[in-house]
Amino acid sequence: LFGKSLEWAGVKKEKATLYGGIGSLLFQTYVEVEDGFRASLGFSVSDEVSNFIGAFLPFFKEKFPTLKIVNFKMSAFPSEKFKSGAHRFIVDDYESLYFWLCFDVAEILKLKQLKFWAFDIFDLAIGYSVKEIDWRGNGKRELFLSLDYDLSKIPVRIWFLKQIFALLNYYHLPAPTLQLTPRLKFFIVKI
């Protein structure tokens, strides 16, 4: 979002994605360092590595176009802990958060010859979440396989609408989903 804001301000895309990555990483590192001072959380090296990857993925996609087949998204759905008031903000409740690695199936399978854009917007996503997290960071890991949508591929000519679609593309929208672990379960729609 930092990079997109810089683009809107007239900064060239390559520089905007670099500066956006730096700004994003600084903010996320601040949050991670703050977690380090909380006994119930602590600093997490794996979280910081994930922060780096997420912050600089747009920059690396500009430098290495083959990476455009992959996208990271997130979604949130209030957990029982959040509903009970254990957290003020949903982003502080890791049990409410889902992280998705999305793949551009049409690009991977070289289906670009399809002339109808509606086929091109469907992607495949692998999702991850954790429930019943304890103070040591242990919990029940959940793995999902889901349909995903690449809204940026919907052909629109209105600039503002394109920007809305680009913003929504950071989030995994409700879709049919198969939960793989801890037990196999199908959801007609999962956030």
Predicted regions and their residues:
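Hydrophobic alpha-helical membrane segments
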Residues: L1-I191
